Amino acid sequence: MKANFQNSDIIVRKGEWSMDAIFNRTSVRKYKQESLKKEEIDLILKAAFSAPSARNSQPWQFIVVENKDTLKDLSQMTTYASFLKDAAMGIVVCADKSKNDSLDYCQQDLAAATENMLVEAKSLGIGSCWLGVYPNEERYLALNQYFKLPKGIVPMWMISFGYIDQEEVAKDKFDSSKVHYEKY
């Protein structure tokens, strides 16, 4: 089902959130037991589709998971995803090799889409955490089998989303020693 953004009641913000959301985004691993609103999910996905991609190939497929049993199953696929069972939603981010057969380029495109989702979630007051899958063969094969993915669709990572139930402490990560002008 496609989201209809043309006729929705969603108010388009004019960037007042972007820098605050970027500077204050944290990885959230503790969530309130509340479902996300459909409009919020649609905005998070719209942010993903607004990302740049090589040759505008948009080599992404997203599996949106809200079912608690499925989230629990996903949380058991790796020790690093244990908190996914308590999230309101998970998204499995997959590369579509029919759009670009280079997983190296797909990773760049999917990373841009993922960061857009993380920032949009933060702007909506929703926490998130990026959970690596690929290139860990055991993890991506488990997801591939679990979702019975068609040939050419490669699960790259998962993202947990939910209303925040932990103290967030954003850190200023800027490090001028890692910035070089004109030469290294």
Per-range role (PLM):
Residues 1-184:
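Acidic, surface-exposed loops and disordered segments
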